């Protein structure tokens, strides 16, 4: 990690320990209203600039940003990039990360703007991601598609694998194959057992990014906004990873890593333990592998 990144991390930890950074309030309905207001302040607008050729597609009522390597044609490989967020629509900050992945790997990038769970159910977001992925596979072929997800986008990536298996198990006439590769940076998900909840709370106390109580309030908000959300969209222990592709998971020693063992156990249960490559980096920060100063995820994607 660079010197500047270490300084930023130290400042964030100091601010949190000093009590200057507050977590969410205890009024769940009020927090949902705040999240919705935040989303309204950040409406989607197609990016401009010469760093990529941008095109806005639509998957139903939701936009999907296509970042093309070449203005007048598509390449023969693609990335499905799932940005973080969850309770609010914070699509813009990761556009540059997604574009950089495409530039370094020579791949087109599809960037769906999934709805936050305070606006639509997690099932609707998962269905959007599945439909976008299926469309990409029809154009490029599954062997040419990689999926990258960070934080809540990492949860969407895990959901996608489970959704593919559910679709195929239902005997649909158009089975959907798995992607060639999946890279998840600090994937967010919920602990299933009280032991893991306790671990998450201990890790939250030291986490420079997530406030104390983040997991509890996110789950409470989800249950309030979308009470019919199935466990298979919340807990890795209830997901189906049969036939999963090579999956690289990067965590810092952070609160999100409380579900690392659940992911590992689920891959083993579903017969693909050797396809999961998990790395927990002490002293790093949330989504560290996707940061420009790291390059770890870039190296996996490009084979360097």
Task: List where the protein language model places each region.
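Catalytic nucleophile-loop/oxyanion-hole region of alpha/beta-hydrolase
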Residues: 91, 110-144
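Short, surface-exposed "cap/lid" segments of acyl-processing enzymes
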Residues: 71-101
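Alpha/beta hydrolase fold serine-hydrolase catalytic domain that processes acyl esters and thioesters
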Residues: 3-44, 77, 137-142, 159-304
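N-terminal cap/lid segment of alpha/beta-hydrolase-fold proteins
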Residues: 31-71
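Short beta-strand immediately N-terminal to the catalytic nucleophile in serine-hydrolase-like folds
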Residues: 147-149, 185
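Gly/Ala-rich beta-loop-alpha elbow adjacent to hydrolase catalytic centers
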Residues: 149, 153, 157
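Alpha/beta-hydrolase active-site loop signature
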Residues: 86, 114-118, 189, 285
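A fold-wide structural signal in alpha/beta-hydrolase
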Residues: 78, 106-110
């Amino acid at each position: 990690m660079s010197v500047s990144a270490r300084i930023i991390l130290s400042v964030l930890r100091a601010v949190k320990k000093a009590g200057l950074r507050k977590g969410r309030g205890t009024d769940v309905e009020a927090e949902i209203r705040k999240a919705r207001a935040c989303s309204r302040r950040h409406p989607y607008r197609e990016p401009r600039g010469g760093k990529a050729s941008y095109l806005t597609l639509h998957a139903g009522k939701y936009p999907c940003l296509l970042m093309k390597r070449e203005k007048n044609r598509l390449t023969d490989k693609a990335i499905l990039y799932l940005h973080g967020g969850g309770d609010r629509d914070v699509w813009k900050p990761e556009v540059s990360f997604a574009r950089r992945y495409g530039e370094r790997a020579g791949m087109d990038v599809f960037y769906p703007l999934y709805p936050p769970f305070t606006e639509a159910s997690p099932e609707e977001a998962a269905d959007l991601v599945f439909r976008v992925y299926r469309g990409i596979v029809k154009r490029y072929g599954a062997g040419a598609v990689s999926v990258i997800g960070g934080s809540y986008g990492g949860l969407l990536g895990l959901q996608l694998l489970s959704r593919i298996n559910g679709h195929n198990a239902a005997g649909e006439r158009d089975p959907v194959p798995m992607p060639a590769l999946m890279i998840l940076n600090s994937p967010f998900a919920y602990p299933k057992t009280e032991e893991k909840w306790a671990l998450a709370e201990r890790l939250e106390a030291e986490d420079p990014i997530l406030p104390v109580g983040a997991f509890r309030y996110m789950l409470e908000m989800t249950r309030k906004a979308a009470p019919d959300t199935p466990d298979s969209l919340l807990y890795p222990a209830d997901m189906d990873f049969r036939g999963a592709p090579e999956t690289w998971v990067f965590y810092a020693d952070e609160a999100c890593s409380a579900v690392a063992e659940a992911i590992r156990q689920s891959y083993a249960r579903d017969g693909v333990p050797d396809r999961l490559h998990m790395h927990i980096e002490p002293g790093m920060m949330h989504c560290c592998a996707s940061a420009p100063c790291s390059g770890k995820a870039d190296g996996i994607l490009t084979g360097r």
